[in-house]
Design a protein with these regions (language model features):
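Short regulatory alpha-helical segment in sensory/regulatory domains of signaling proteins that mediates
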Residues: 111-114
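C-terminal, well-structured catalytic/ligand-binding subdomain of enzymes
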Residues: 1-4, 9-101, 105, 117-119, ...
Length: 280
């Protein structure tokens, strides 16, 4: 399985925004789940119904996004030979954390619950942003980041654990280039609703496989998600032909008025269309 992602956190005019660009080598089936925990916390999250990958937010304005570090070893979502997808252990960790009643408890849960979430995790509450970096070979490094100084971007190579993740060759180059390019696009974007569409249009001179949104035979961007933690809004973007949205599972109590909102949007063009048929 190949799992390459970009996660982003930035302040947009006082609104903390988390975003994720999700690349896969299979066609995911995604759904949105609405629920209220036994403690009265409303949660809304996107889940891959085959692997249990989960990202989302709660009514306290706490959101979580994640990208992998052990791209091919720990995250074996899909085997082309067996045509099967192994469940992600991080899905239950994210849902457990989103059900917590405080930001501190949410961060603690992500760091320790069932051994702690793996990879790069960005978790924010609209005011504070915490970056967690963890693998099955290391201990988690937890740092508070000041988004008022600069945005945060993470891809698939280690920062606090530089020996982890992509380490050599085109994989390392891809991860580093995507991080630099994503940071540049993020800096240049003034409206949070334009962030991921700007990722979608991104091009650079090293060829399509290094674009932020890609359409390759072995790897392609299947979906994107952006969360405005202040406005408590989630937007899920679908890439044509690369993902299937299977609907909404609404577990909210009858008569409950949701505090969280979401939209599902589908791009009208494929990523390769930006090259006008002249891909290299």
């Amino acid at each position: 399985m190949i799992d390459e992602c970009i996660t982003v956190a930035k302040m947009f005019n006082g609104d903390m925004v988390l975003a994720k660009n999700r690349d896969r080598n299979y066609r995911p089936r995604l759904k949105i789940v609405r629920d209220v925990t036994s403690y009265g916390i409303e949660i809304c999250y996107i889940v891959d119904v085959d692997t249990d990958w989960t990202e989302g937010m709660n009514n306290l304005g706490i959101g979580v996004v994640n990208s992998a570090l052990f791209v091919k070893r720990d995250e074996k979502d899909y085997s082309k030979k067996k045509k099967t997808k192994a469940p992600s252990k991080d899905g239950v960790r994210v849902r457990e954390a989103l059900g917590k009643g405080t930001f501190q408890d949410c961060v603690r849960s992500l760091a320790v619950y069932h051994g702690g979430i793996k990879g790069h995790t960005l978790v924010g509450n609209g005011k504070k942003l915490v970056a967690i970096e963890n693998t099955s070979r290391t201990k988690p490094v937890i740092k508070v980041k000041d988004l008022n100084k600069e945005p945060i971007v993470r891809t698939n190579h280690g920062i606090e654990h530089p020996e982890q993740g992509y380490q050599q060759g085109n994989d390392k180059l891809s991860s580093e280039l995507r991080m630099v390019n994503a940071l540049n696009v993020t800096h240049q974007t003034g409206d949070w609703r334009n962030l991921l569409p700007n990722f979608y249009r991104h091009r650079q001179d090293k060829g399509p496989k290094y674009d932020l949104v890609r359409a390759q035979n072995k790897l392609w961007t299947s979906s994107q998600v952006v969360m405005n933690l202040k406005q408590k809004e989630i937007i899920l973007y679908l890439v044509p032909g690369q993902v299937k949205f299977v609907g909404v599972e609404n577990n909210l109590p009858k008569g409950y008025k949701p505090k969280l909102s979401f939209r599902v949007l589908k791009y009208s063009k494929n990523p390769e269309d930006k090259y006008g048929g002249n891909k290299s």
